[in-house]
Amino acid sequence: GGHPGGARRDPRPRRTRALRSQGAWYLPAPVRFHVLTIFPEAFDSFLGASLLGKAIKGGRVRVERVQIRDFSTSRHRTTDDAPYGGGAGMVLKPEPFFEAVESLGPPAGPVVLLSARGRRFAHADAVRWSLARELTLLCGHYKDVDQRVADHLATEELSIGDFVLSGGEPAAIVVLDAVVRLLPGVLGDHESASGDSFYEGL
């Protein structure tokens, strides 16, 4: 018994039907990255360069930069305030973060706060996140982010090292690069990523 019109249905799942010429499987739907920041322009050159730029142009990855100031309710779109519970310095208010994440719809992946006090980012995190359909990165600035963002919004809190940055944007670039290069088809073949030193246990 044939199929109408002589067409046969491919029995493989739709997500894995297509092969790249290099032999690596790819997922037709792009992996979505949301980056919440008060400095979206900090990512301009990085998003257009190297592997990430190619992955975006090839439809493999979609990166959306969300301007946190757009969700500020203050007259001058301010996003900083004194720390909740007291303390020195200024921190980013929690409300714009909550509103911005809510505007993205129901989360389909981890919501990661990039913070100096977070757990150290490791290759295992990049591998785990490369399997997600979506990843949301929250970039702090000033002294820090209001603690309520870490307690009630982020699913994870990570740092890229024991040093101080002026904001979470450089850390977000590190995470994006580490995750995107692991996506099937981005490097051209699986051996390119599986031959990395961390895969080899070094």
Predicted segments, located by residue:
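S-adenosyl-L-methionine/SAH cofactor-binding core of RNA-modifying enzymes
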Residues: 92-141
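Hydrophobic/aromatic beta-strand patches that form the interior of the parallel beta-sheet core
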Residues: 34-36, 64-66, 110-112, 135-137, ...
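N-terminal nucleotide/polyanion-binding subdomain common to many enzyme families
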Residues: 25-104
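Short, solvent-exposed amphipathic alpha-helical segments in soluble enzyme
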Residues: 50-54, 127-131, 152-153
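Structured adenosyl-cofactor binding patch, chiefly the S-adenosyl-L-methionine
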Residues: 145, 149-196
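Compositionally biased, low-complexity flexible segments
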Residues: 1-24
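Long, charged alpha-helical interface segments
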Residues: 199-202
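Short glycine-enriched loops at secondary-structure junctions
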Residues: 68-71, 141-145
